[in-house]
Each structure stands twice: as C-alpha cells, then as structure tokens.
C-alpha cells in the first residue's frame, strides 16, 4: 500500500494496543473499519490522519462508546460503512445487511452529531472519495 500510495483498511477487533503500536511504527494512511475504540483513541487515530468507519453496529444498544468516538472525531475523517452481509443496523439487526440500509446508520450518527442526515451523507461520501483518491484530479484507482 505504501509503495502504491494506497490506503489500508484495518479491522481491529479486541486488539487495540497491538494495533496502535503497529500504527505508530508504520504510520499508514487508511481506514479503521468498523471502529470500536473509545473517544480518546479516536482523537489520536484521526490526528495520525486515519479515517474511522462506522457501520450498523453504531445503531446497537451498546454502541455508546462508538458514538462518543464519532463525536470526538473531525467530521472530515468519518465514514459510513455497511460491513455487508453482516452487522445490519437496527431495526434490521440479525438480518442480511446491504448497502440500502446505510441510511439507518446515517440517521443514528447524524442525530448523535447533531447534523442533518443529508449533510452527513454528503460529507461522508466526500470523505470516502478523498481517502480512496477518487476526487477530481485523483488517480481514480483503488
């Protein structure tokens, strides 16, 4: 990824300390997919230039920590994700997830961030284009 100047996508599941040690060592650009860390870690990660992805799990009852992390993060480093076919948002939890359900995650995140849903959708789409180099003038290849 570094040689090709491409982002990496990391899924850190119950391995925050070793993951952050690797991030300190290699300083990659990319995304923490399905972010599950706390607000303090989110602040550190985004200060390193990383993006944080939030999916259907952000709509679950126990998602307070993830939502606090989203609130602690710069809006230009937040992403919406689906994690298809898993982690469908409430009210579809336990069912097959698909990209058509992302609006449910956006609604919860927008409410928590106190921004209009359309603004969140526009912003996170622009963030995705930026991190993958799909902006105008970008390479257009991922």
Segments predicted by a language model, with ranges:
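Active-site phosphate/pyrophosphate- and oxyanion-stabilizing loops and adjacent acidic/basic residues
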Residues: 67-68, 107
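Short glycine-rich anion-binding loops that position phosphate/pyrophosphate groups of nucleotides
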Residues: 57-58, 85
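Amphipathic alpha-helical segments at domain termini/boundaries
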Residues: 87-89
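Short, basic, glycine/proline-bearing loop/turn elements
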Residues: 49-55
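Non-cysteine beta-strand/loop elements that form the S-adenosyl-L-methionine
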Residues: 76-84
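Mid-to-C-terminal alpha-helical segments outside catalytic/metal-binding sites
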Residues: 102-142
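Divalent metal-binding pocket/active-site signature
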Residues: 1-48, 60-61, 68-69, 73, ...
